[in-house]
Amino acid sequence: MPLHLLIPLLLQHLRSSRLSIAAYMTQPSQTPRILLLVVSLTSLCLSLSFSTASPQTDHRYNVGDPVPLFVNKVGPLNNPSETYEYFDLPFCRPDYLVKKKESLGEVLNGDRLTNALYDLKFREDKTGEILCHKELKGDEIARFRDAITNEYYFQMYFDDLPLWGFIGKVEEESWALDGKGPKYYLFKHVQFNAFYNGNEVIEIRAFSDPNHVVDITEDVETNVKFTYSVFWNATTTLFENRMDKYSRVHWQIHWFSFINSVVLIVLLMGLLIVLFMRHLKNDLIKFASGDEEEDNEVGWKYIHSDVFRCPSQMLLFCAILGTGTQLLTLVSFLFALAFLGILYPYSRGALCTSLVVIYTLTSTVSGYSSASFYSQFSETGWERSVLLSGVLYLGPLFFTVSILNTIAIFYGATAALPFGTIVVIFLVFTVVNIPLLAFGGVIGHRSRSRFEAPSVTKKFPREIPPSAWYRKTTGQMFLGGLLPFSAIILELHNFYASLWGYKIFTLSSILFVTFIILIILIAMLSVGLTYIQLTVEDHEWWWRSVLRGGSTALFMFGYCFCFYAKSNMRGFLQLSFFFGYNACICYAFFLMLATISFRASLVFVRHIYRAVKNE
C-alpha cells in the first residue's frame, strides 16, 4: 500500500479506537506532559542502548594474546567522503576475507572493517615481520601510483583505536637524482608503536617507513616484500583517558568566538531595551490611561483584530512547526548523549545510530505539535497536516540520499549503502516512524485547546499600507539572518571543518553554548522585527517570523560555497556529497530556527495585546 494512503488509515484507526488510555489522555493538562515524558525517556534509553552496545572484547589482554586489528578503508586525503574498501588496492590480503559485523551506524558512516594479515599480539615486539611476498603487475602498479598521486591514506582500527598512514610518497623532479621527473614510491614497511597500561591497550601509532620503499614510477612488474614491525611501550595513561589524544582543543579560537557572540547579544539587548522602554512602554501607558487622542498616534493598536488571523497555507505552516519541534528535540538528545560521554570522536557509528533512533522515536513530537496547533483553528484536516509534517524533512532527505547513493555506487565508494541497509532503514521508518507519527497526531488533536487570542478577529482582513523595502519580508530576512550568522560564523567554520576535514570538534559544551546563543539571537531579533512590522500596521507577521528565523540557515548554506572554495576538496563525488548533505543540514536548521522565531513572536504579540484595553 502506498505510504500516502497508509498514514491517513492509521490515523483514522487510532482516532476511532476506544482504548481506556485515550480517555485519560484527552485531558489537556495531562497529555502533553505524559507524551513528552514517555518519548523523552524512551528515546534516551534506546539511544543509550544502541550507542553503548556490548563490544566483542573487554579490552583486557594477557601477554601474547592477539589484539584485534581490522583494516577499514582508503581514500584521498582531501576528499573525506571519497573512501573505498581497503582491498580495492592490491595490498596483501588473507585467503578468506571476514567482514566484521557492523552496526547500522557504522554502515551509514561508510565503515567496512575487514580482517588482515597483520598479527599483533599483546606486548610482543616484532621486527621486520614478513606480511607477504607480492608480485605487482603493471595495472596494479598503476593503481598504486594513482593512489599516491591523490595522496591516499589508509585507516585501520586496533582494539577500537583508529590509526592512519600514507600509502606512498612522490619525489618531485627537483629532488629526483636523475632529473627525469617525479618519482613515485610505495611504502612497503609499516611500524606500529603500541602503548599499554597493565593489561590494556592505551594508544597505537603507525609509521610508514620512508627508508623502505619501492619505485613504481614505471608500469613494470615488480616483486615486493611487504613487512611490518611492532614495538610495545608502557605508559601511565589510564584506559578511560585513551581517547584524549584525539581531543586536542584550541581554546583561543573558541573564546574569541564566544566573546564575539556575547558582545552581539549585549548590543541587541540594549537596542531592544531602548525600543521597548521608550516606545512600547509609553504606548502601553497611553492605552491603560484611555487617552484616545494619543492612541491615534500608534499603529499597532489598530490591527488588534487582525494580528491573530489564521495564516494562509495553514497545513504547511503547522507542518513546519511540527518538524521544527521534532528536530529541536533531536538536537537536545544529541547534546545529552554528548554530555553523558556516549558520543565522542571516532566512536564508530554512534552518531548515525543515534540520529536514526532518536528521529524515529521523536516523530511522535512532530505529529503532536502539528496536530495540536492545527486543531486550534480547524476541526478537520489535521490528518493532512500530520502527513505533511512526516514528509516535510524526510522527503527531501530521502531524495538527496538516493541521488548521492547512486553516485557512490557508480564510483564504488564505501559511502554507497548496501541493499540490506536500505531495506532496514525503510522498515524502521514505515513500521516504527509512521505509527508513532500517527499516534502523536491523534493525541495532539484530542488534547487541543482553544487558541488564546486576546482580541476578536474580524471577518475581513485590514488592508496593509505600503512600507519601505527594509520593512518588507526580504529586508527582514536579510537582517534577521545576517546578525545571528555573524555571531556563529567562527564556530560554524569549526563545525564544517569537523564534518568535512580532520579537525576534531570535541567540546560539546562550546557547541551547546553556541547553539543557545543562536536561539537567543533568533528570538530577540524575531521579537524586535515583529514589533517594527506591527507599528506600520502590517498584521501578516506569522509567515514572516518563520522566514526571517529560518533565513540564518540560508547564510549557513551560502558559507558552504566559501568553505569549499578555500578547501582542497575536488572531484564530482566529493562535490555532490558536500553540498548535498550540507543542504540537508541547513534545511534542518531552517525548520528549527523558524519554529523558534515564530514561538518567540507569538509569545510577544500575545503579551502586548493582553496589556491593552481592546474595544
Where are these regions (language model features)?
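Cleavable N-terminal signal peptides of Sec/SRP-targeted secreted and luminal proteins
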Residues: 6-12, 32-50
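Soluble extramembrane domains flanking the early transmembrane region of eukaryotic membrane proteins
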Residues: 48-258
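Hydrophobic alpha-helical transmembrane segments corresponding to the first two to three helices
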Residues: 244-409, 442, 446-447
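Single-pass alpha-helical transmembrane segments
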Residues: 257-273, 428-435, 516-524, 581-594
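Transmembrane-helix exit/juxtamembrane "anchor" motif
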Residues: 270-285, 434-453, 521-535, 592-610
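Cytosolic juxtamembrane regulatory segments of membrane proteins
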Residues: 287-294, 451-466, 504-513, 542-551, ...
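Membrane-water interface at loop-to-transmembrane-helix junctions
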Residues: 303-322, 418-426, 457-484, 505-514, ...
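Membrane-lumen (extracellular) interface motif
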Residues: 325-361, 367-388, 398-427, 488-512, ...
